[in-house]
Amino acid sequence: MSHQCYLTGKKTMVVNAVIRRGKARREGGVGRKTTGITKRVQKANLHKKLIRENGVLKRVWLSAAALRTLNKGPYQGVELACRC
């Protein structure tokens, strides 16, 4: 089972970690300068939950955003098996 949201498709992303020095112009400096850029991993906020989809129980990964949306009930035929 991959670490990917079952409903929204959110998963791990590769993003840039930017290191800067200097003082911002709005604070009276000459501006921020980039001194280094490296790759880093940004993980989705995933939780393993039990859902009922068309009467069948499934244990899946759900993002926090999908859990909030699921509590409102807009996904057709999908509901949390336990409101814990």
UniProtKB/Swiss-Prot annotation:
Annotated disulfide bonds: none
Sorted alphabetically, which keywords does the UniProt record give? Ribonucleoprotein, Ribosomal protein
**What residue range is the signal peptide?**
none
Any one Pfam family match given in the protein's UniProt record, by short name:
Ribosomal_L28
Any GO BP:
translation
- GO MF: structural constituent of ribosome
SUPFAM superfamilies on file: L28p-like (SSF143800)
- Where does the source fall among the domains of life? Bacteria
GO CC annotations, alphabetized:
ribonucleoprotein complex; ribosome
Tell me yes or no: is Ribonucleoprotein among this UniProt entry's keywords.
Answer: yes
List each coiled-coil range: none
Name the protein family. Belongs to the bacterial ribosomal protein bL28 family.
Q: Which PANTHER family match?
A: 50S RIBOSOMAL PROTEIN L28 (PTHR39080), LARGE RIBOSOMAL SUBUNIT PROTEIN BL28A (PTHR39080:SF1)
**What's this protein's name?**
Large ribosomal subunit protein bL28
Per the UniProt entry, what species is this protein from, by scientific name?
Deinococcus geothermalis (strain DSM 11300 / CIP 105573 / AG-3a)
What is the taxonomic lineage of the source species?
Bacteria, Thermotogati, Deinococcota, Deinococci, Deinococcales
